[in-house]
Amino acid sequence: MEDDSLYLGGEWQFNHFSKLTSSRPDAAFAEIQRTSLPEKSPLSCETRVDLCDDLAPVARQLAPREKLPLSSRRPAAVGAGLQNMGNTCYVNASLQCLTYTPPLANYMLSREHSQTCHRHKGCMLCTMQAHITRALHNPGHVIQPSQALAAGFHRGKQEDAHEFLMFTVDAMKKACLPGHKQVDHHSKDTTLIHQIFGGYWRSQIKCLHCHGISDTFDPYLDIALDIQAAQSVQQALEQLVKPEELNGENAYHCGVCLQRAPASKTLTLHTSAKVLILVLKRFSDVTGNKIAKNVQYPECLDMQPYMSQPNTGPLVYVLYAVLVHAGWSCHNGHYFSYVKAQEGQWYKMDDAEVTASSITSVLSQQAYVLFYIQKSEWERHSESVSRGREPRALGAEDTDRRATQGELKRDHPCLQAPELDEHLVERATQESTLDHWKFLQEQNKTKPEFNVRKVEGTLPPDVLVIHQSKYKCGMKNHHPEQQSSLLNLSSTTPTHQESMNTGTLASLRGRARRSKGKNKHSKRALLVCQ
C-alpha cells in the first residue's frame, strides 16, 4: 500500500558526456564537487556496497561489513506464536517476517548492540533484540509482543502491515545513529540495517542528440511493484526497468547541448541488498479496493537482469518469508505470514497459531510483501546450523517443549512480556509516531529529477551533486491521545475468530500520495537551485 520508505541515506548524481564543457557551476551549487565517474567493475555480494563508497566519500563507517555475524545463531526449529492484542495482526505478521530474517536475527542474538548501546530505553534495536530472542527461544509457546514495539504507531485500530514494517526498519536504522549525530549523510548509509536491507537505484538518462549521459544514484530499503498489468513478479520487475523514451512535451533538457532533445531514461538496480523486500501494490489509491489477482512469485529469483550490469552472472535470491493480507479492501481484513525456519521447513504464522506448511501452499498465496535473501547468505546460515554451530539459547530456560508439526501447546498461559518502564513507552512515542512518520513522507516526496516517468532538470556537466537528507532527528511532542491507545496487554490467548480483525487502515490520502513515487524510499532535499 505504500511504496515509500524512510531512511537517512544520501543521493549522488553524475553527468558524464562524450563532449565535456568547461562551464563552471554558479554560486547556487554550493554542494557540488567536480569528479569523474568511477570506473565500474562487475558487481558481487562483496563489491556492491563498495561501489557506493566510490560515488561519494564516506567519513565514517558506522557498521563495518566484517562485523555482520557470518554464522547462524538461530535455533533450527520454529519459534513462538504471537498473541493478538486487539487489531494487531499487522504487527504480528510483520514481526514474524523480521524475526526470521537471518542476518538480522543473528545480529540480534549476538547481543552486540545492547552491550554497547547507551540508550536502552526507547531504542528500537534493543527492543527488537529482546523480542527476537524471546520468540526464537520459546518454541511451542505464545508470547506477547512488547508495547514498545508499536509505541507511537498503534492507535487501537488495524493499520497497514507494510507501513508498520518500514516504520520499524526505519526506527532500527535511526537507533544505529546515537553517538554519530554529526556524521555525513553518506556514512549513515553504512548502518547495519542499510547493509542488510539497503541497495542503490541507478537512474540513467541518455541524450539522443549529443549522447550525453546523466546518472543518478539513490538508496532504497524496499522495492514496490505495480502489479496491475503483471502476472508475475518477474513481469513487474521487467516493467520497472523498461527504458522510457522522452520526446515531444516530455523531451529532456540536456545540460550539454543546452536544448530540449529526445532522450531515453532507464531505472535499474545499481547495487543489490542482502535481503530484498518486494512490495506488491495491491490496493487502489482512490477507493482502497484490493487488486485480488494471483501474481506468481518464484521460490528462487534471479535479479541480475534488473541490475545496471546485467551480464555478470546470476544473482539468485531465495524466498524465506511472505506477508499476506486476507480480505477485499484496505479498510478491513486480516494479516498473517509464512516463514521458513532455519531447518528449511515452512510455517504459517497466524497470530498465536503456528502450523507447518509446504512450499506449494506458500507459493499459492495472494502475497502482499515478499522477502528474499541472497542464496549464498541463506546457504551459509543453513550450513552453520547443520554443523551444530547453534549456540545455547540466550537467556532462555532449557526446555524441550517443541511444537509438533507446528501445533502450539495451549495448556499454559501466554508468556508475558517484562513489565515496561512507563518512561520507555513515553520516550518511544515521543521519538517516533505514526502521524509524524507520515508527515515526513508527505514532505519528502519523490523528486521529479529522479522519478523514472518525469523529466530531470538541467545540471552542469561533469559534476557530483550531493543531496542531503530532509529528514530531521527531532520528533513531535508527546501526544497523550496516542499514548492512551497503545497496545492493551492482556493475559488471555485470543481465539482464531478474535484474531480475524477488521479495522481501518491508513488513510486513502496517504495512499494517493505514496503512489506518486517510483519505487523509491529516500526523499532528498535538493540543496542546489535548478
UniProtKB/Swiss-Prot annotation:
Primary site of residence: nucleus
A Gene Ontology cellular-component term: nucleus
GO biological process: protein deubiquitination; proteolysis; regulation of apoptotic process; regulation of protein stability
UniProt feature, compositional bias: Basic and acidic residues: 382-392, 398-413
Superkingdom: Eukaryota
Compartment(s) where it occurs, according to its Swiss-Prot or TrEMBL record: Nucleus; Endoplasmic reticulum
Catalytic activity, reaction form: Thiol-dependent hydrolysis of ester, thioester, amide, peptide and isopeptide bonds formed by the C-terminal Gly of ubiquitin (a 76-residue protein attached to proteins as an intracellular targeting signal)
Single GO molecular function: cysteine-type deubiquitinase activity
Biased composition (Basic residues): 510-524
Annotated segments matching region Disordered: 382-413, 509-530
Active site residues of this protein: 89 (nucleophile), 334 (proton acceptor)
EC numbers on record: 3.4.19.12
Residue span(s) of domain USP: 80-375
Keywords: Endoplasmic reticulum, Hydrolase, Nucleus, Protease, Thiol protease, Ubl conjugation pathway
UniProt-listed InterPro entries: HABP4_PAIRBP1-bd, Papain-like_cys_pep_sf, Peptidase_C19, Peptidase_C19_UCH, USP_CS, USP_dom
Job of this protein: Deubiquitinating enzyme that removes conjugated ubiquitin from specific proteins to regulate different cellular processes that may include cell proliferation, progression through the cell cycle, apoptosis, cell migration, and the cellular response to viral infection.
UniProt similarity note: Belongs to the peptidase C19 family. USP17 subfamily.
The protein, known as: Ubiquitin carboxyl-terminal hydrolase 17-like protein 20
Organism the protein comes from: Homo sapiens (Human)
